[in-house]
Regions:
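Short, charged/polar, Gly/Pro-enriched secondary-structure boundary elements
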Residues: 44-48, 299-304
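S-adenosyl-L-methionine-dependent methyltransferase catalytic module, highlighting the catalytic core
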Residues: 107-121, 146, 150-156, 160-300
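Eukaryotic beta-rich interaction modules
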Residues: 53, 69, 274-276
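Active-site donor-binding segments of glycosyltransferases and PAPS-dependent sulfotransferases
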Residues: 51-67
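Short, charged/polar micro-motifs that form catalytic or ligand-binding hotspots
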Residues: 10, 131-142, 249-254, 281
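Conserved SAM-binding loop
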Residues: 61, 67-175, 292-296
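Charge-rich, low-complexity intrinsically disordered regions
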Residues: 1-56
Length: 305
């Protein structure tokens, strides 16, 4: 095969044409031969041809290979699709579609929601799974530790929690400090079920634009950012007080790959959680998210803390 510049490009020994198309849906949609595409373009473009957990598509593929999988919070655009997949959300499918229509989201992939809890209570799920996946979900949990333990209790021994997590450096959380072990433990000891005023102020007043390339270029703040902070803080307090103790959807936690791994490691050593960090991948250039796999070791006992 003649590649670009007339060079002969041999295929990697472990190249799988079908997997290449699954990892690169734009190639599949174009109807291009996967072997030809990889040899002429894919290699130079750094296209994935093996499933690994460092990307959204890769971690989805690994999770979908489990005998049974649960996706938390799919909304109308699930990461996992298949007969082996169940879904948990705070709204029914009908309500998700209604909400999606209100905000202009595509509804063609809206899944049937197998488990519905308006307050996000995972304990209503009456089955165990080999894999659980969530995308941009864990940062919304008022009690980070409780969430991890609830997931662990849904996993079979040896099962894994697959996560797609925003990297605070490259999303609208760029102006907020990374979360500390003190904050995470305090939220758990308090039994926090709704977000704190601190989280509300951070989310409504201190967030910035959500353009990853600009963040990667070091341009995280608009010229009007500083001048707007004070007025936004007042509005944040009003929104929190107006909630009258109810749930307001904001980010409670901010991580980078390094601080997330450190957090999980510390919580394990403190015996607050029973999941261990098996893989935590760096954020890809130009992206605003990273991936992680937390494993439930065999002989793991149920944690209720």
């Amino acid at each position: 095969m003649q590649g670009i510049g007339g060079m002969t490009d041999s295929l990697p020994f472990d190249f799988d044409p079908d997997l290449y198309l699954r990892l690169n849906p734009d190639v599949a949609q174009a109807g291009v031969d996967p072997v030809t595409h990889y040899q002429c373009f894919g290699r130079q473009e750094g296209r994935l041809y093996l499933a690994n957990a460092s990307t959204r598509s890769g971690i989805a593929m690994l999770a979908s290979e489990a005998v049974s999988a649960l996706e938390i919070g799919p909304f109308c655009n699930p990461v996992l699709i298949g007969e082996n997949v169940s879904y948990f959300d705070v709204l029914t499918r009908a309500d998700l579609i209604k909400r999606a229509n209100e905000i202009g989201y595509d509804i063609k992939h809206a899944p049937h929601i197998d488990f519905v809890s308006p307050n996000g209570d995972l304990s209503i799920v009456d089955r165990k799974f080999d894999a659980v996946l969530s995308s941009h979900c864990i940062e919304h949990q008022p009690d980070f530790i409780r969430h991890l333990n609830d997931v662990a209790n849904l996993l079979n021994e040896g099962g894994a929690y697959f996560l797609i997590i925003p990297d605070k450096r490259y999303c609208f959380d760029a102006g907020i400090e990374v979360s500390s072990i003190a904050e995470v433990v305090a939220a758990h000891i308090e039994g926090r079920k709704v977000h704190s005023l601190t989280s509300a102020i951070e989310h409504f007043a201190l967030t910035t634009h959500n353009d990853p390339p600009r963040h990667w270029e070091g341009n995280s703040f608009d010229d009007t950012y500083e001048n707007a902070v004070l007025s936004r803080i007042k509005l944040a307090v009003q929104a929190w007080e107006g909630g009258k103790g109810g749930y307001i959807d904001v980010h409670a936690w901010q991580f980078t790959p390094t601080t997330f791994r450190e957090m999980i490691t510390r919580l394990c050593k403190l015996n607050y959680i029973g999941l261990v960090a098996e893989e935590v991948h760096e954020t890809a250039l130009g992206s605003n998210e990273f991936t992680a796999i937390l494993r439930k070791p065999k002989q793991h006992s149920v944690i209720t803390a």
